[in-house]
Amino acid sequence: IDECKELTGEEREVMKAEARFLRAYYYFNLFKQYGPIYLWYDQIADLAIKSEVIDRNTVDECVGFIEKEMYDAAQILPKTIQDPTTWMGRMTKGAALGMRSRVLLFAARPLFNGGGSIGYGRGMVNHEGKPIFPQGEDLNKWTKAAEAAKMVIDLDVYKLHFNKTETDPVLKAMNSYREVFTEKWNEELIIARYYKDGEVWNQRVVPPRVFGVGLGGYTPTMKLVDAYPMMASGRYPVTGYKADGSPIIDDKSGYEANGFTDGWLHPTHRDKGIKVHNSMKGRDGRFYASIFFNGMYWIHPDGTKEQYAPVTFFTGGTSSYAHSSGDYVKTGFVFTKFTDPNIDTRKNTWGSFTWSYLRLA
């Protein structure tokens, strides 16, 4: 790259820093997938080398190399993108420091920090008999992770995104969260990919057979649905599961595990009541921005008499299993997290969305 004279010296240095960060990022992905790995450092990888000749580096060596590479890249990368129309999405100082904080947080958790109560990894050694995993917990790793996160906050570049029009607390919370993924390059995003054509996601979450265009293929599990807290109490309603799979309920959360309510008004369509299982009521605004459940209406924004399309997933329902098609919702839920409510999915218009790899929240 130093031979590319069409670039300024500063541009060349930034590109080198981008490459250094991306190399560290992909090392981190390998580390998450496989645990401690072999580090080539600045050597050119020998593709012909035999795996039995090389050995894994230790957890601390992997983490130390990755986080230092990210920190060093951050010293050169720009604080903000000066030409966002052309270059938004390229790496910045905040991207490198933010991902570094995630690396350090990952390394501080018990799995890679002493192995917790079961001592995971303590018996693993390399060919030389050197332990690959830390042999005890180091509480300073949590401090280092917190300090790394504070460095990102102190850049004063990123802010939590808030909806600017709603006054109702539930709607404000719901739309603030939703807009993080539907408003292009909003102030909360640190590393993201913008999808101009939202079909890659939205068609696959629209309930099938209601409009003839949905596939209903991406569905949340019951455990994910249970993971959202209650709006009023802020408590998590399900704290675990019994041996038979039934949930353990926090009685102080305000959660109702049984029964149905007729005429309940969902935050997104308050002028049209629905019959709802009581467990769907009173949840955090992020729940209603993310989870579409049985009995809800899929809303079209054009104001016609067909604006509200009822969706039911049970046998014989409007979006139930059909023998002629493999497209059906197995869990009774679909996602609405990345779907802009202003798009009309009946017309094969899928809008856009942002996939966040790292954000301030």
Predicted features, each with a name:
Residues 1-34, 49-93, 256-259, 276, ...:
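Conserved, well-structured interaction surfaces
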Residues 2, 28-32, 99-109:
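Short glycine/serine- and small hydrophobic-enriched flexible loop segments
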Residues 16, 63, 67-70, 97, ...:
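Extracytoplasmic/secreted envelope proteins and their assembly/folding machinery
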Residues 20, 97-103, 360:
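TPR/Sel1-like alpha-solenoid repeat signature
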Residues 37, 41, 93-94, 104-316:
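An aromatic- and glycine-enriched ligand-binding surface/loop that stacks and positions planar moieties
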Residues 42-49:
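Short linear capping/connector segments at secondary-structure termini
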Residues 316-328:
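Glycan-recognition/cleft segments
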